[in-house]
Amino acid sequence: TLTLYAGAAPAMVRSGGGGNIVDYTPAVAETPETWSVSNAAEFGFSAIGTDVPTGTWGTDADCIAGADVPSTTLKWRDFDLTGSADQIATSASQTTMAGTSATMCVATQQASVFAASGSYTATITATATAL
């Protein structure tokens, strides 16, 4: 099982405080959906890979649809609001010594809104555990 955990809420924090970028706001919290941001700056994530369920995360081989455009066939969501880890991949069988591929995709989109200038950091911890 592969999980992700955001070290802050919101996940994308502006250095020096203030002006943080809010987590993506899907129609149903913590439920992946097609990326849709209107008049806001938001930060969300998706996943692709061998053991990443496409029913949950969508289907694409790349994180982006084009320059600065999140994939339109992946499903995106916010980080867990309760502070627990988010599962992105799992396998019922043992992987080979080479392992399997899993990629966390991130998107930050501004639609008619400008984020405050400065440096931003998102600390995301990925944890792989044996079932």
Language-model segments: what does each one mean?
Residues 1-131:
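Signature of Gram-negative chaperone-usher
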